[in-house]
A protein has these predicted regions:
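Non-catalytic signal-transmission and effector/linker regions of two-component phosphorelay proteins
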Residues: 1-8, 18-21, 108-126
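Acidic catalytic/metal-coordinating carboxylates
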Residues: 36-37, 64-69
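Two-component/phosphorelay signaling modules centered on CheY-like receiver
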Residues: 14-33
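A Lys-centered signature of the CheY-like receiver
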Residues: 105
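Hydrophobic/aromatic residues positioned on beta-strands within the core alpha/beta folds
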Residues: 85-86
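Short amphipathic alpha-helix used as the core "switch/output" element in two-component signaling
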Residues: 67-78
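Acidic, metal-coordinating helix/loop segments flanking the phosphotransfer/catalytic sites
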Residues: 34-53
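Active-site residues of response regulator receiver
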Residues: 57-58
């Protein structure tokens, strides 16, 4: 793995997960773990001592939201960059973690890479 950045992508849409994985790994420099909800995300949190970024859809199947997972991820990995995504323009953003980046679907690769970079900068201690 070397200097690859470790990214966790959480979405309940398999097509979105696959597209994001292809995009992030194809761009280079990213090692991607995909989770189709909170169970997969929690397993990834347990399995990896380090994550550079978490990208999570706000609305997930079940009771846990992407915001909940980002908050948990930040507690477990204090310097993780957080990117919250959603296609719903009216989604409730209450509880959005401090220093996270919001990105509205649909978005392009350049927007995603810029959001990850911005989230990582915001997550660094001052």
């Amino acid at each position: 793995m070397g200097t690859e950045k470790m990214v966790l992508v959480v979405d309940d849409d398999q097509a979105v997960l696959e597209t994001m994985q292809i995009l992030l790994e194809g761009h280079g420099g990213f090692h991607v773990h995909c989770a189709k909800g909170s169970l997969g995300a929690n397993a990834c949190f347990s399995a990896h001592a380090h994550l550079d970024a978490i990208i999570a859809d706000v609305l997930l199947a079940g009771e846990t939201t992407g915001i909940d997972l980002c908050n948990l991820g930040r507690r477990l990995h204090p310097q993780v960059g957080l990117v919250v995504i959603s296609a719903d323009p009216h989604v409730e953003m209450e509880g959005l973690p401090k220093n996270s980046v919001y990105l509205r679907k649909p978005f392009g690769g350049n927007e995603l890479f810029a959001a990850i970079e911005q989230a990582q900068v915001l997550a660094q201690p001052t």
